[in-house]
Amino acid sequence: KEYNVRRAFEAGWGGVVWKTLGSEGPPIVNVSGPRYGAIWGADRRLLGLNNIELITDRPLEINLREIKTIKRDFPDRAVVVSLMVPCEEAAWKAILPLIEETEADGVELNFGCPHGMAERGMGSAVGQVPEYVEMVTRWVKQNSRLPCIVKLTPNISDICQPAEAAKRGGADA
């Protein structure tokens, strides 16, 4: 949200990755209770955390307006917009110009989320198939001037394969 990013930038942060945006479609319903779960070891030491939040449930147009306002007010700070849309070229072609209009500094392709969105053919459902990673990354690079960061899923046996696919597709990072 603009409020949170503004507070961060006023505190001196140099950049942010905006919460993952999606295209218009079936509504996203996030949980209203605790968003994180703890994984405890046998000795009750904290081993890790797991979140259960999906992509933003806020309308795309509100996020785009807020990103544009933040970039106007903080032109020297980096704003990378995280994206997760269906694995269809038309969906990526439609959203990329909207992101460019905000003056964002880059896009992150969210191929990592293992829950909630994989059932819709997004997130880790893309990140687990190197051919999809390469294909979508290439679409983004062909249709946008923005630097492209590919966020991969850890839910795969060999992360090198999708990483190499992202590189072949033209990812900047």
Residue ranges of predicted features:
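N-terminal capping/small domains of soluble enzymes
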Residues: 1-80, 84-89, 93
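Alpha/beta enzyme core
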Residues: 6-11, 15, 72, 86-173
